[in-house]
């Protein structure tokens, strides 16, 4: 996927723009990020938050969720048509935490959706600024990816929990547009397609009539998005087969699960962007930084820079480790939930631990948790180096599918060889004789068997000093190969529940 050809860059997807040159992209992404910051500052004023309260990541998330809910047209329409008792469909809200007498207290705020939309538009030059909303969705999705494991969802669709590294973006809402589709992992797309096929099998009218025609168009579009993520001809040909099926059923589900497994070695191309909480953008705007004039990129040094000098707090439960909470948020900020821990550790400059070793639960606090015992602490979100985010699955230049790992989807474009247990992965292919046997399947299995873990990915790509903003001196790290690199390895992370 080296040739960009007709592909729009992330930033163009992110800003809904047509083809632009680098400066225009930087300016429009800057405008988007600056708009989020201006909106956040205005909300802090409206809610009368002190400086410290405005830097609390939990407050940031509540404010982000409120504006996303205000613009969720489908759900708003549904709520107005199905009124539930004691709930005003025109209002939205959430917990805001304030500092009172040396303690953190929770206050539930309710806000008029119309008013939120007005404040958001005003912060974004009177526009709807859908790109900014999608950006917030991706930040929430990255946070979920780093916090929860989707074992249950995988098992429900007949996939293997070991495929968790393919599940990036699995909690993104449907309405997240092209930018959302770009960051979804192969497993996420497969899961969406399987759910769709299962509905079609169980509900005779799913593919029929005017509605069914629209469903069919959506199905084919999702197939094309998934096809575009695969980097080998055989995988793409198999996707054509799934897309063209007259009446999708079990054969297609089998093919999709086969393709998802194959993606553990023949990696898909999945975009990664650093999306920061709104309060970070707010802090920068408040300090007089002009994002649009300076320009901004989600895949370069800018987010690292921003995190180097912003102070964000988080509420900490009594038995949680603040350093571990920081790691969780750092990973979410850089979309690194499925990155090799050795690469993340090198960039961050402190050891990044697997999820199972972290003494921390999610960032959000449930409404029934006791606030009396809550403390707050500063999140350490700084890094030692920065690296360019990647949208390749990490294949070598020879376009030969190179190694993946049962749990790595690279986030950073940094040279490494991707260790993987071929035996473990190939074992997953022996169990199931169902599905069509085809030249494509044979070809895919052959490619997987021939891929070598020793092959180096991202040749010559390295990390950069934070002073090296033009990325002139790559430092190519050497990694200790004995170290297991996956984050959800042997894990006991909580499940994600909607």
Curated annotation (Swiss-Prot):
It comes from the Viruses. A motif (Unconventional nuclear localization signal) lies at residues 1-18. It is found in: Virion; Host nucleus. Its main location: virion. Late in virus-infected cells, may be cleaved from a 56-kDa protein to a 53-kDa protein by a cellular caspase. This cleavage might be a marker for the onset of apoptosis in infected cells or have a specific function in virus host interaction. A motif (Bipartite nuclear localization signal) lies at residues 198-216. One of its GO terms (molecular function) is RNA binding. GO terms for biological process: symbiont entry into host cell; viral penetration into host nucleus. Keywords: Capsid protein, Helical capsid protein, Host nucleus, Host-virus interaction, Ribonucleoprotein, RNA-binding, Viral nucleoprotein, Viral penetration into host nucleus, Virion, Virus entry into host cell. Residues 1-22 are annotated as: Disordered. One of its GO terms (cellular component) is ribonucleoprotein complex. InterPro entries: Flu_NP. HAMAP family: INFV_NCAP. Encapsidates the negative strand viral RNA, protecting it from nucleases. The encapsidated genomic RNA is termed the ribonucleoprotein (RNP) and serves as template for transcription and replication. The RNP needs to be localized in the host nucleus to start an infectious cycle, but is too large to diffuse through the nuclear pore complex. NP comprises at least 2 nuclear localization signals that are responsible for the active RNP import into the nucleus through cellular importin alpha/beta pathway. Homomultimerizes to form the nucleocapsid. May bind host exportin-1/XPO1. Binds to viral genomic RNA. Protein-RNA contacts are mediated by a combination of electrostatic interactions between positively charged residues and the phosphate backbone and planar interactions between aromatic side chains and bases. Belongs to the influenza viruses nucleoprotein family. This is Nucleoprotein. It comes from Influenza A virus (strain A/Gull/Maryland/1824/1978 H13N6).
């Amino acid at each position: 996927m080296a040739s960009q050809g007709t592909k729009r860059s992330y930033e163009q997807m992110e800003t809904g723009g047509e083809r632009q040159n680098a400066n225009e992209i930087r300016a429009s992404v800057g405008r988007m990020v600056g708009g989020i910051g201006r909106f956040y500052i205005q909300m802090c004023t409206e809610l009368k938050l002190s400086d410290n309260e405005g830097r609390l990541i939990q407050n940031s998330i509540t404010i982000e969720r409120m504006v996303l809910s205000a613009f969720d047209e489908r759900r708003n329409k549904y709520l107005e048509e199905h009124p539930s008792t004691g709930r005003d469909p025109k209002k939205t809200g959430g917990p805001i935490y304030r500092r009172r007498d040396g303690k953190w207290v929770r206050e539930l705020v309710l806000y008029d959706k119309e008013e939120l939309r007005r404040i958001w538009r005003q912060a974004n030059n009177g526009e709807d600024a859908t790109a900014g909303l999608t950006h917030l969705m991706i930040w929430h999705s990255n946070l979920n990816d780093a916090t929860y494991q989707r074992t249950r969802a995988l098992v429900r669709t007949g996939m293997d929990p070991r495929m968790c590294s393919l599940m990036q973006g699995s909690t993104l809402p449907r309405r997240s547009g092209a930018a959302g589709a770009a960051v979804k992992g192969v497993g996420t797309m497969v899961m969406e397609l399987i759910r769709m096929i299962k509905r079609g099998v169980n509900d005779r009218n799913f593919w029929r009539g005017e509605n069914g025609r629209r469903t069919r168009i959506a199905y084919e579009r999702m197939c094309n998005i998934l096809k575009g993520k695969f980097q080998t001809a055989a995988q793409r040909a198999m996707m054509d087969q799934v897309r063209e099926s007259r009446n999708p059923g079990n054969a297609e589900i089998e093919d999709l699960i086969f393709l998802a497994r194959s993606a553990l070695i023949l990696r898909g191309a999945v975009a990664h962007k650093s999306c920061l909480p709104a309060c970070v953008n707010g802090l920068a705007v408040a300090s007089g930084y002009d994002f649009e004039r300076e320009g901004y990129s989600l895949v370069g040094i800018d987010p690292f820079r921003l995190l180097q000098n912003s102070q964000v707090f988080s509420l900490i439960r009594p038995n949680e480790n603040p350093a571990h909470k920081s790691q969780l948020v750092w990973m979410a900020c850089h979309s690194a939930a499925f990155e090799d821990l050795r690469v993340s550790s090198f960039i961050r400059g402190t050891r990044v631990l697997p999820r199972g070793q972290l003494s921390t639960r999610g960032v959000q606090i449930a409404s029934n948790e006791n606030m009396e015992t809550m403390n707050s602490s500063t999140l350490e979100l700084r890094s030692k180096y920065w690296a360019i985010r990647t949208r390749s699955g990490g294949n070598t230049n020879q376009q030969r599918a190179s190694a993946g790992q049962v749990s790595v989807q690279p986030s950073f474009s940094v040279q490494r060889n991707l260790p993987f247990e071929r035996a473990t992965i190939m074992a997953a292919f022996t169990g199931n004789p169902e599905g069509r046997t085809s030249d494509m399947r044979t070809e895919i299995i052959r490619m997987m068997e021939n891929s070598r873990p020793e092959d180096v990915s991202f040749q010559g790509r390295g990390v950069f000093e934070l002073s090296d903003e033009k990325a002139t001196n790559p430092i190519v790290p050497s990694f200790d190969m004995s170290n297991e690199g996956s984050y959800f390895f042997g894990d006991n992370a909580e499940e994600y529940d909607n």
